[in-house]
A protein has these predicted regions:
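Charge-dense, helix-prone N-terminal extensions
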Residues: 23, 27-28, 32, 65, ...
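N-terminal beta-strand motif that seeds the catalytic metal site of vicinal oxygen chelate
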Residues: 1-16, 24, 70-75, 126-130
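Core segments of cupin and vicinal oxygen chelate
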Residues: 8-55
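Short hydrophobic/aromatic beta-strand element in the GNAT-like acyltransferase core
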Residues: 35, 45, 74, 109-111
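Short connector loops at helix/strand junctions that flank enzyme active sites
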Residues: 2, 41-43, 66-70
Length: 130
């Protein structure tokens, strides 16, 4: 059984992408001139790969995330305030909001794109029992 998750994302400008994720309050584990690993949690990392490196792994080309959504990456947090803080930091770091906040009683979430157009959501699940 797998115990860790590594999500690989292509980026056009690695230094700009590193600055964006640093702006979200995230840190890195391992960096090279063509890749950097963003620590999401103890068991999850997002590997930022330059388009050239990503293409060397991809079986059928690199998708332009600004032209279509290849995935929605969801970051789970504990509170509504943390959802707002993360989404606000993303916008301050140069990302763009996606849609409007969703609040349906059992979850609260806000979406944003990073500098390469990858779609992210900050999500808090709300216990209906309080």
């Amino acid at each position: 059984m797998a115990t860790k998750l590594f999500v690989n994302l292509p980026v056009k400008d690695l230094n700009r992408s590193k600055a964006f994720f640093t702006g979200l309050g995230l840190t890195f584990f391992g960096q090279a001139e063509d890749m950097a690993s963003v620590i999401i949690s103890e068991h999850t990392q997002v590997m930022l790969l330059t388009n050239t490196v990503f293409a060397s792994y991809a079986r059928n080309g690199v998708v332009d995330a600004t032209a279509g959504t290849e995935a929605i990456l969801v970051l789970g947090v504990e509170t509504r305030d943390q959802v707002d803080q993360l989404a606000d930091r993303a916008e301050e770091a140069g990302g763009s909001p996606v849609g409007t906040p969703r609040d349906d009683g059992y979850r609260y979430q806000r979406g944003f794109t990073d500098l390469d157009g990858h779609h992210w959501e900050a999500l808090c699940l709300i216990d209906p029992a309080g």
